[in-house]
């Protein structure tokens, strides 16, 4: 028994002294492996008398249990120490700016950045975001928006139509995000305050037009909404988006089937050697269209125009992105040129706020 106690003490000391998992495994094999010291003692039980086997067997198994428990406890300690050392070696400060690397790094596309900027600005004014399908019905895209039969936008050369259904109805790629406004008015009761960003499609392609582009439209429906509210919202948006403290705006009469009166908005700017500066100068630049929602549109969406009125506006996201960040050709936004994106794109984590731009 004294030999067993000495062996147990020796093994436990070796376990405590093991400095890593490899050394601990060597101790385990030497003690509990097929040819281990404790395993050898267990093999001698068959040669003992029943009384000896009962006494010695209990003692050897007790020693084996103590060694097994000590191995498990030491293994947990070593694993925890190894993890702590690894974490200490791999610690990084995630608040530090990204380091320049010869390897290519991904960039945030200017359209994604601008989408974040404008949704954040309007969210601060209390607007929610509404979305809808790219493939729309003629009814939602045109009829409920007061487009009369024979309107040029309903012709094949302006709109991507699908083949007619057996009943003669046609599906199409939406030409604006206004159908989202229709869907919102049909499913929500006033007051309504939403913006509708998304992809739109028209048959057009040149330096300032592409068959697929992005729009954001806004809609407010309430009992007391008026053009003064619309003017304030657009004025505050332009100041925040173009990062100026003051900007003059000019509202010009226009015509859209879904608004009455209809207006187009110009903003003050100065052109200097190919650069556009907003909030100063004597030039004017058209930026969006807007107006009071036509009573026919309200009726088509189940809203009583004698009780409620509202206003709406729409602008091209691609266009305002080009104006803010100095891009000259709209088509480059969709070409997937990595060199172009490395110049105009944004490095992750380098834009301090969603509403921030180049000046930040």
Swiss-Prot record:
Cofactor entry: Mg(2+)
PROSITE patterns listed in its UniProt record: AA_TRNA_LIGASE_II
Catalytic activity: tRNA(Phe) + L-phenylalanine + ATP = L-phenylalanyl-tRNA(Phe) + AMP + diphosphate + H(+)
One of the GO BP terms on file: phenylalanyl-tRNA aminoacylation
Gene3D superfamilies (UniProt xref): Bira Bifunctional Protein, Domain 2
UniProt enzyme class: ligase
Subcellular localization(s) per the UniProt record: Cytoplasm
Residues reported to bind Mg(2+): 260
Keywords in alphabetical order: Aminoacyl-tRNA synthetase, ATP-binding, Cytoplasm, Ligase, Magnesium, Metal-binding, Nucleotide-binding, Protein biosynthesis
GO CC list: cytoplasm
InterPro entries: aa-tRNA-synth_II, aa-tRNA-synth_II/BPL/LPL, Phe-tRNA-synth_IIc_asu, Phe-tRNA_ligase_II_N, Phe_tRNA_ligase_alpha1_bac, Phenylalanyl-tRNA_Synthase, tRNA-bd_arm
A GO MF label: magnesium ion binding
Cofactor: how bound: Binds 2 magnesium ions per tetramer.
Record protein name field: Phenylalanine--tRNA ligase alpha subunit
Source organism of this protein record: Bradyrhizobium sp. (strain BTAi1 / ATCC BAA-1182)
Lineage: Bacteria, Pseudomonadati, Pseudomonadota, Alphaproteobacteria, Hyphomicrobiales
Protein's gene: pheS
């Amino acid at each position: 028994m004294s030999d067993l106690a000495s062996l147990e003490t020796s093994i436990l000391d070796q376990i405590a002294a093991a400095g890593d998992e490899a050394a601990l495994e060597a101790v385990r094999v030497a003690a509990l492996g097929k040819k281990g010291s404790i395993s050898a003692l267990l093999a001698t039980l068959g040669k003992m008398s029943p009384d000896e086997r009962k006494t010695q067997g209990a003692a050897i198994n007790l020693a084996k249990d103590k060694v097994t428990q000590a191995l498990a406890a030491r293994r947990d300690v070593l694993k925890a120490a190894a993890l702590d050392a690894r974490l200490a070696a791999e610690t990084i400060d995630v608040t530090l700016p990204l380091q320049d690397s010869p390897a290519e790094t991904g960039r945030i596309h200017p359209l994604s950045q601008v989408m974040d900027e404008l949704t954040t600005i309007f969210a601060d004014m209390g607007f929610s975001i509404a979305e809808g399908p790219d493939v729309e019905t003629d009814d939602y895209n045109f009829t409920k928006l007061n487009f009369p039969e024979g309107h040029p936008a309903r012709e094949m050369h302006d709109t991507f139509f699908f083949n007619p259904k057996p009943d003669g109805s046609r599906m199409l790629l939406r030409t604006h995000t206004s159908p989202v406004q229709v869907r919102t008015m049909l499913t929500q009761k006033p007051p309504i305050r939403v913006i509708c960003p998304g992809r739109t499609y028209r048959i057009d392609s040149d330096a300032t037009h592409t068959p697929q582009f992005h729009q954001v439209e806004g809609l407010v429906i309430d009992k007391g909404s008026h053009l003064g509210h619309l003017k304030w919202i657009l004025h505050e948006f332009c100041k925040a988006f173009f990062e100026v403290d003051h900007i003059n705006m000019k509202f010009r009469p226009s015509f859209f089937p879904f608004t009455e009166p209809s207006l187009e908005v110009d903003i003050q700017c100065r052109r200097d050697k190919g650069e556009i500066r907003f909030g100063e100068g004597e030039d004017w630049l058209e930026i969006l269209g807007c107006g009071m929602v036509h009573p026919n549109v309200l009726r088509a969406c189940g809203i009583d125009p004698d009780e409620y009125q509202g206003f709406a506006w729409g602008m091209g996201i691609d266009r305002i992105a080009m104006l803010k960040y100095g891009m000259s050709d709209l088509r480059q936004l969709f070409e997937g040129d990595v060199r172009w994106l490395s110049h105009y794109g944004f490095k992750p984590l380098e834009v301090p706020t969603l509403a921030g731009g180049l000046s930040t």
